[in-house]
Every structure is written in structure tokens, then in C-alpha cells.
Swiss-Prot record:
GO terms for cellular component: cytosol. It is found in: Cytoplasm. UMP binds at D77, T139, G140, N141, P142, F143, F144, T145, T146. Transmembrane segments: none annotated. This is Uridylate kinase. Gene3D superfamilies: Acetylglutamate kinase-like (3.40.1160.10). The keyword ATP-binding applies. It comes from Buchnera aphidicola subsp. Acyrthosiphon pisum (strain APS) (Acyrthosiphon pisum symbiotic bacterium). It holds the Pfam family AA_kinase. Inhibited by UTP. Belongs to the UMP kinase family.
Length: 242
């Protein structure tokens, strides 16, 4: 990967879905997936990009799914919240083990001895000093997704864009696994997404991004070098703006 060009984003909020971490497994964490993503993060930090990180919990437990199985919704969401902490701990340890860049794991709920409580001023200071800040435990509240947490932290930390790393190449007109005529959108407006009822993220999260004019790019983080290319201005995945 060449560093001749200058990156176009000073600070990003990277949202990674939990499913990305499970690799080819049906459940849990795949160490090879962790290492590959950690290396991509390390590379962009070393060229000067500031990175905030939010990780989902779909590889472990989703609150909404657990509630459908009969658990209380609040308890289900608390299990999902704790699952994000597990994923975040794994990512922090992986980054620390393969690179020299610094990390800080913050939680929206108190978890003494495991990670520190989220603090806005400290997070801003750390990001400015090129420390990767991992925001875990979602918003700390039930009924809110990690997409909502990503939008919230992205707006709070004045990120230039939310980059949503998934297992697919971007936003499609329909599910490409079910419809051979589905096509990939390269650019969309917030209005387009709402009108077409495209499932980019939940409505609460998406509305928050729209109201604060926070651009979102959905891309396939499994594609080698995709994160770096986006940072350098390549039109990879799908960009959503006003």
C-alpha cells in the first residue's frame, strides 16, 4: 500500500459488525479476522488518521434475538451490551499484541478493573494524540443498537465520517444472496435511504446521523486494503450523505 497520497479524513469512527469477527465460524471470535482488521487499523493510524472504534455483538449475542427466544428485553439487551465488551477486549488485546500503536478501551457502563468509563474530554484528548479509542457497551442503555452508539460517538468526537465495515460490498437494492438482479448503490442521500427503505442501520441511528449531517460509508472490511483505500479517497462501497 502506497502512502504517496494524502488521506482525506482526519478522524473516523469505524463501526465493525460482530459478524465480521467470527470469520468463517458460525459463532465466536476468529483470531485471524481480528489480526487482519487490527493490521489495517494500525496502518492508517501510522499515517496520521485518528480512529474511534465501535464493535457490534452479532457474533456472540444480540439482545433483540434473545428477547424473541423468551428472555426479558432489557436483560437481553444487557447481554448484548456485555458481548460488545468481550469483542472490544479481544480487539484491544490484538492491536496491542501486533503493533506499537496505543489503545484505550472505554465503556458506557462502569466495569472497574476491565475498562474505564467513557469520558468525553479524555476521549477527545486521546484521539488527538493518535490513540485508538474503542467505545464499548453501546450507549449503555437497552433498546439502542451499536449502530446508534457508533453514530452517537462519531458525532460527539467530531469525526469526519462513520465507516461501517461489514461482510458485504456496500448497500444493495435488494439482498444479493436472494435476488440475482440486485445492484450495488455507489452513492445515496439520506432521503434515498428512507424512501427506498434500505436497511443500512436502525432508524434511530440513521436519523441521528442524518440530523447531524454525518456521512456514512458502508463497505466490505474483509476486502484487503479497503479501509486504507477509503481513507485515501477511493469510492469503495456505498457513501450516504445529504
Amino acid at each position: 500500500m502506497s502512502t504517496d497520497k494524502k488521506f482525506i479524513y482526519r478522524r473516523i469512527l469505524l463501526k465493525i459488525s460482530g459478524e465480521v469477527l467470527q470469520g468463517v465460524n458460525k459463532f465466536g471470535i476468529d483470531i485471524n479476522s481480528l489480526k487482519r482488521i487490527a493490521k489495517e487499523i494500525e496502518f492508517i493510524v501510522k499515517i496520521g488518521v485518528q480512529v474511534g472504534l465501535v464493535i457490534g455483538s452479532g457474533n456472540l449475542f444480540r439482545g433483540a434475538k434473545l428477547s424473541k427466544l423468551g428472555l426479558n428485553r432489557v436483560a437481553s439487551d444487557h447481554i448484548g451490551i456485555l458481548s460488545t465488551v468481550i469483542n472490544s477486549l479481544a480487539m484491544r488485546d490484538t492491536i496491542n499484541s501486533i503493533s506499537s500503536i496505543k489503545t484505550c478501551l472505554m465503556s458506557a457502563i462502569p466495569l472497574n478493573g476491565i475498562c474505564e468509563i467513557y469520558n468525553y474530554e479524555k476521549a477527545m484528548n486521546l484521539l488527538s494524540n493518535h490513540v485508538v479509542v474503542i467505545f464499548s457497551a453501546g450507549t449503555g442503555n437497552p433498546f439502542f443498537t451499536t449502530d446508534s452508539a457508533a453514530c452517537l460517538r462519531g458525532i460527539e468526537t467530531e469525526s469526519d465520517i462513520i465507516l461501517k465495515g461489514t461482510k458485504v460490498d456496500g448497500v444493495y437494492s435488494k439482498d444479493p444472496n436472494k435476488d440475482s438482479h440486485a445492484f450495488l448503490y455507489r452513492r445515496l442521500t439520506y432521503k434515498d435511504v428512507l424512501k427506498k427503505e434500505l436497511k443500512i442501520m436502525d432508524l434511530a441511528a440513521f436519523t441521528l446521523a442524518r440530523d447531524y449531517h454525518m456521512p456514512i460509508r458502508v463497505f466490505n472490511i474483509h476486502t484487503p486494503g479497503s479501509l486504507y483505500r477509503i481513507i485515501m479517497g477511493d469510492d469503495e462501497g456505498t457513501l450516504i450523505t445529504r
